[in-house]
Amino acid sequence: MSLIGSDRIRAVVGLGATGLSCVRFLASKGIEFYVVDSRENPPGLEEAKKLCPEERIFTGDLDVLEALGVTELFVSPGIALRTPVLSRLAERGVAMRGDIDLFRDYVDAPFVAITGSNAKSTVTTLVALLLQACGKNAKAGGNLGLPALDLLSPNTDFYVLELSSFQLETTHGLQADLACLLNVSEDHMDRYKDLYEYQRAKQKIYRGCKAAVCNKQDILTAPLLAEGVPVRAFTTKSPDLKEYGMLEDGDGAWLCRGVERLYHTSQIALKGSHNHANVLAALAMIELLGLDIMSESIAKV
């Protein structure tokens, strides 16, 4: 059910791919909004003009937002919330939201949210492929491929979203059915004051989640969750019970769950320790989604 109120004055800020997806979505729902972009002639301008009255489109300066009396902004991920006009509006109580907030309001199927400094595209793609191999209508997107709002359609069994830290900044109470933070290392330090501010943005993926997967070898991925929320950890070392990891014996190296051997590394098309970690994370997610990780369909992927 939508959480969008009818008395709000909204604007989409930025006409990149994500901003345009917000324009398309809001227009499809018959919701009034402004469009504002700091560029005089942004690449999505012509499409926006087909969906929004020209008198509600402003380009060349974001400061016009203050004159519009906005109460709710859908900010494109490429625009930092530290931008002066956005900071001033936030101080006045204007809601700073993003496309993933909109997605969450309207999605009617389970969704998986995946982030990390590295490998998030690989793992997002792999989880979607594994779900499809199990006969599920799974759609992948977000920061990868199609924007999340463009994925929404009937008869979808699962959505698998790659999310960037920029997207998570404007996401409040994500409530993913399954959230995964793969790793955290210094990235986008031109946007964040330090590693820990960046980590805090990444950690927002866990807010309200029903289950989680984290990296045992990276303490910055460890979630703080309510008691009873299922969590699976993965590691490229020997795993503890219920963890996913690697074991070696006379037959070679194995991907394992606890002491249970799952797949020999020779069966894995993706080679190298980093890719084994990606596969382990994906298997942990498939288990938490209630599917058989040892099925013939999974083994063939």
Model-predicted segments: where are they?
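Adenine nucleotide phosphate-binding catalytic loops in nucleotide-utilizing enzymes
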Residues: 8, 13-15, 194-196, 230-301
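Cofactor-binding loop segments of dinucleotide-utilizing enzymes, especially the Rossmann-like FAD-
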Residues: 15, 38, 116-117, 143, ...
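Short, surface-exposed amphipathic charged segments that create phosphate/polyanion-binding patches used
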Residues: 70-76, 110-116, 242-255
